[in-house]
């Protein structure tokens, strides 16, 4: 499937609504009539206020959650359950604490039938690519936060996903480590050209990384606007923030996003007033 520009559509959400039901039976609508497209090889960042359904959007694309209404397609095929073409890097590490770095990274290939020795060799290749050489036999609790994120990236990318979903993967890191990880991510993405959907609360991070930024409304979430990020590549995420065009993009997108942040904030104050 292609879009009007002739590029292959990697992801398509068409009229998607997602409702959840609480234990008491109350219905909560996280997303309503959301339309979104990501073309092959695109780096798309998604921003919006807390609780607007950004993470839910990733869960629908991955197949971890079904839609209530509408359709999600990956390369033209409706999503019906988890697909191996999609990799997912969560906000919190999804590594196995009882396994060392090599065994954590090799899990994916082994699951898909690659022999143990070959899986370990492939794991070592990816360990080197993400900058963890020398730590092959360390356990997750022996690694720094940045190293654990590198481990999570290797664990996901070793499976060569055509689509990479990332849910605030660097939010818990310090500023310096975060900038290093963002640059490493861009280098890995440039080599793989996977289609990326990157959820973040940090608008600067979104602009520094992405080809396009999607703004989601206060919940129930739907797409409010999209912005093309016409900054040159390759990028250094720390340096590009000082470019005049970066500042201009930030002002344009923030003027749009802040209205939704204020709506979300006022709603949260009302909930506190009702339930002190």
Question: What is each of the regions a protein language model found here?
Answer:
Residues 70-82:
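Conserved ABC transporter NBD signature motif
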Residues 62:
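Helix-to-loop junction immediately C-terminal to a conserved catalytic motif
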Residues 110, 117-135, 187:
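Conserved ABC ATPase "signature" region
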Residues 99-107:
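Short coil-to-helix segment of the ABC ATPase nucleotide-binding domain corresponding to the Q-loop/switch region
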Residues 47-49:
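The feature captures the beta-strand-to-loop junction immediately N-terminal to the Walker
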Residues 153:
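Hydrophobic anchor residue at the start of the ABC signature
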Residues 138-141, 159:
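Conserved signature/switch motifs of ABC ATPase nucleotide-binding domains
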Residues 164-167:
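Catalytic Walker B motif of ABC-type/P-loop ATPase nucleotide-binding domains
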């Amino acid at each position: 499937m292609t879009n009007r520009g002739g590029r292959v559509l990697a992801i398509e959400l068409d009229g998607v609504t997602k409702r959840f039901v609480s234990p008491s039976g109350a219905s909560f609508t996280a997303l309503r009539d959301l339309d979104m497209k990501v073309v092959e090889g695109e780096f798309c960042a998604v921003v919006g206020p807390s609780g607007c359904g950004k993470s839910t959007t990733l869960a629908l694309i991955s197949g971890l959650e079904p839609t209530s209404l509408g359709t999600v397609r990956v390369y033209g095929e409706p999503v019906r359950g988890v697909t191996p073409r999609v990799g997912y890097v969560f906000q919190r590490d999804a590594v196995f604490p009882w396994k060392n770095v090599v065994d954590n990274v090799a899990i994916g290939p082994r699951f898909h039938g690659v022999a143990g020795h070959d899986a370990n060799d492939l794991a070592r290749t990816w360990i080197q690519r993400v900058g963890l050489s020398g730590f092959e036999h360390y356990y997750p609790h022996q690694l720094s936060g940045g190293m654990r994120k590198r481990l999570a990236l290797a664990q996901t990318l070793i499976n060569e996903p055509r689509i990479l979903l990332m849910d605030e993967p660097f939010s818990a890191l310090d500023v310096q480590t975060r900038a290093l990880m963002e640059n490493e991510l861009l280098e890995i993405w440039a080599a793989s050209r996977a289609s990326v959907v990157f959820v973040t609360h940090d608008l600067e991070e979104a602009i520094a990384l992405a080809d396009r930024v999607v703004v989601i409304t206060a919940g129930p979430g739907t797409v409010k606007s999209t912005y093309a990020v016409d900054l040159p590549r390759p990028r250094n995420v720390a340096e590009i923030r000082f470019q005049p065009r970066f500042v201009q993009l930030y002002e344009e997108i923030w003027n749009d996003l802040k209205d939704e942040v204020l709506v979300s904030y006022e709603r949260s104050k009302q909930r506190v007033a009702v339930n002190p």
